[in-house]
Amino acid sequence: MKQMIIHGGKPLKGDVWIGGAKNSTVALIPASILSRTPVTLEGVPRIADVDNLMDLLSEMDVKCDFHETTLRINPDNIKRSPLPAGKIKSLRASYYFMGALLGRFGKAVVGFPGGDDIGPRPIDQHIKGFEALGATVENKNDQIIITAPKTGLRGAKIHLKMPSVGATMNIIMASVMAKGQTIIENAAKEPEIIDLATFLNNMGAVIRGAGTEVIRIEGVEELKAQTPHTIIPDRIEAGTYVALAACIGNGIRIHNIIEEHLDSYLAKVEEMGVVIDADEDSLYVYPAGDLKMIQVRTDVYPGFATDLQQPITPLLLTAKSGEGVVIDQIYPKRVGHIPELQKMGANIQVEDNIILVHPTHHLHGAHVSAGEIRAGACLMLAGLMADGETIISNAGNILRGYDRIEQKLRQLGAEVSVIDV
């Protein structure tokens, strides 16, 4: 197990560069096996999830070469093999192999997916999509077995009951080489969907409407990667550093961002009174003055991202007066970080899955646990604000989602280390 040790209370300043989007990367890597030629991904974040996905690729005899931020994937000798449940359970996003394997081989056998414990995240919409394309889906011995008919997958009209990012991506990957046209209605509109579609289109796919609620896919015979693909910047990492800069920054510039991907989040941060200057691809966050409380309500994109409700919580604690309210409409039970913040002296409560935040003028270090990625980010920010030493157990969860986090925090002046225990 990894621990993050933070000696907090020190103002941070300087520059930080945002890595490639985790939520794109964990789909693009499985999608690479759809190509008949080697794939090059640029701007790949150095996160544990990437290492885990490369391990899964090695199970299929797919060669990977990861140098700095460039990942080369060679599927020339790929073999169709079941993916082990143990590794799948440690990485929820590995469910993207369902769509990729089904699209490439007409069959996928994967262990039940795992990942962060933030409440129910059923894959029923993924299965509904696969079945609409003609596949059969079975659950056997902790495995999901998805099989295309002998005549191959056929395009279909698929209406999602909610705009699920995972289901949208999986259906795109499964249908990109299906016969005929596939239409996804009520599709997710996140930037990462557009990134996946761009990647596949550059390999010869025909995908239109990504980023809107209706996506149309015309099946093609095969896909071949021709040019490197640069992954979009991580809007969740960027939003986390915006909160950090406002909480305890003494002037921080955040590079490699796409501002429009953060519109809803930045509007809320600025509503609190944080002053931000935006350039073409960077943000400068000024030291915060007196801030006011706000209400945050998460929603599907382009609304306030559920992955940013926890990182913004320490910033709410710094407000001078009033009561802040956080309502997560996407994952209402995403409140596991609240008892941990209370250990640090935070005046914060949960009532019926609604988070109530009150001004807290002093946080103290404590021994806390990161139950999942974004809860870990929240506790990390609180630890940087707090006086004394904070020890975050299960810090591996933070490393799953944040590119070179220890190095980046140190460059801003933080006293932080990650150790194995």
Curated annotation (Swiss-Prot):
Per its UniProt entry, what is the enzyme's top EC class, as one word?
transferase
Q: What are the EC numbers?
A: 2.5.1.7
Q: In the UniProt entry, which residues are flagged as the active site?
A: 116 (proton donor)
* Catalytic activity annotation: phosphoenolpyruvate + UDP-N-acetyl-alpha-D-glucosamine = UDP-N-acetyl-3-O-(1-carboxyvinyl)-alpha-D-glucosamine + phosphate
Q: Highest taxon of the source?
A: Bacteria
Q: Which Pfam families match?
A: EPSP_synthase
The record's Gene Ontology biological-process terms are: cell division; cell wall organization; peptidoglycan biosynthetic process; regulation of cell shape; UDP-N-acetylgalactosamine biosynthetic process
- Pathway as given in its UniProt record: Cell wall biogenesis; peptidoglycan biosynthesis
Sample GO molecular function, one term? UDP-N-acetylglucosamine 1-carboxyvinyltransferase activity
The residues listed in the UniProt record as binding phosphoenolpyruvate, with positions renumbered to this chain, are: 22-23
Annotated residues that bind UDP-N-acetyl-alpha-D-glucosamine are located at 92, 121-125, 307, 330
Give UniProt keywords alphabetically: Cell cycle, Cell division, Cell shape, Cell wall biogenesis/degradation, Cytoplasm, Peptidoglycan synthesis, Transferase
Which PANTHER family does the record match to this protein? UDP-N-ACETYLGLUCOSAMINE 1-CARBOXYVINYLTRANSFERASE (PTHR43783), UDP-N-ACETYLGLUCOSAMINE 1-CARBOXYVINYLTRANSFERASE 2 (PTHR43783:SF2)
What's this protein's family per the entry? Belongs to the EPSP synthase family. MurA subfamily.
Alphabetical list of HAMAP family matching this protein:
MurA
Q: What is this protein called?
A: UDP-N-acetylglucosamine 1-carboxyvinyltransferase
Encoding gene (name): murA
